[in-house]
Amino acid sequence: NVGYYPNFTAKKTIEYFGYLRGVNKKELDSNVEQVLRDVNLYENRNDKVKSFSGGMKQRLGIAITCVANPEIIIFDEPTVGLDPEERARFKNLIRKLSKTKTIVLSTHILSDVEEVADYIILIKEGCLTKFEKIGGKDNE
């Protein structure tokens, strides 16, 4: 969950969190536009967050995560509450991000994992029970 300032616009919210994470102004300007497009909020960039639906706020949270261009991104149940179109868009974003970043995706939605993961790790009661390459059986 991300704390939002309801009177900030989507763009201002992302800029603010990027600033807090130490992103320099030049990089922030280009990254904000890109992440807004990536999460399909570009058309809503000047709308106040208080007018956003739950799914839009969730996508805004994803944009906030991505704006600082981290090497590792951890998503916990990121597609819950997204409609099918936005779920597909998010999976495409994960595929794009995973080319240059390590993505850890925690989910109960098997189709999310099957479509975007290279490896599956199952943890039960804090213990690793499975580590497997998707499409193969070569445990590493």
Predicted regions and their residues:
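Catalytic Walker B motif of ABC-type/P-loop ATPase nucleotide-binding domains
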Residues: 73-76, 82
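Conserved ABC ATPase signature
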Residues: 48-52
